[in-house]
């Protein structure tokens, strides 16, 4: 894309802004002319996936779901992961002590599948962003007290295609990446 990033963030330097009633620390994800964003409200009791038009900033759709509030670190949010995208779907993950919820929506906002991968234990809250690799959604879920796993879900169905148990006793915050041998 042909654009220049401004050195100052002033109103004259951006085309539109989008006031949000909810919050989150994840980054927006862009596919074509659509911007997707995860957000949360009411101390995590509501989780939201939002789609806006990248040209105008107008909200195209919002999908909100009930969730459970829980303790998290004061510098974390209840929506700290970035959505993953492919040409057909937007994928989001949300974690708290009793569940790790992965979901897929089509680009028009219709829910395709949801999958609960168990809880997340850790004093700082959940913050992992999934990635799409080929036809798999990759989600790490290391646990502070051990017993976590890394998952590969089928992008189309949400079925677990593989799971790697992890002995780690540290919570994961990094986004996975795919290594290609030279």
Locate each region found by the language model:
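Noncatalytic, solvent-exposed loop/strand surfaces
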Residues: 1-182
């Amino acid at each position: 894309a042909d654009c220049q990033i401004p050195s100052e963030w002033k109103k004259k330097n951006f085309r539109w802004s989008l006031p949000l009633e909810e919050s989150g620390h994840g980054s927006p994800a862009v596919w074509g002319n659509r911007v997707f964003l995860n957000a949360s409200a009411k101390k995590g009791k509501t989780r939201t996936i939002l789609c806006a038009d990248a040209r105008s900033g107008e909200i195209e759709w919002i999908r909100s779901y009930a969730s459970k509030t829980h303790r998290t670190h004061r510098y974390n949010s209840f929506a700290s992961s970035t959505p993953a995208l492919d040409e057909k779907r937007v994928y989001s993950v949300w974690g708290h002590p009793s569940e790790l919820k992965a979901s897929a929506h089509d680009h028009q906002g219709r829910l395709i599948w949801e999958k609960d991968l168990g809880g997340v234990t850790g004093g700082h809250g959940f913050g992992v962003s999934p990635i799409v690799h080929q036809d798999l959604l990759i989600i790490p879920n290391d646990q502070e007290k051990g017993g976590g796993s890394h998952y590969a879900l089928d992008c189309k169905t949400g079925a677990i295609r593989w799971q790697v148990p992890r002995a780690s006793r540290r919570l994961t915050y990094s986004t996975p990446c795919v290594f290609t041998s030279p």
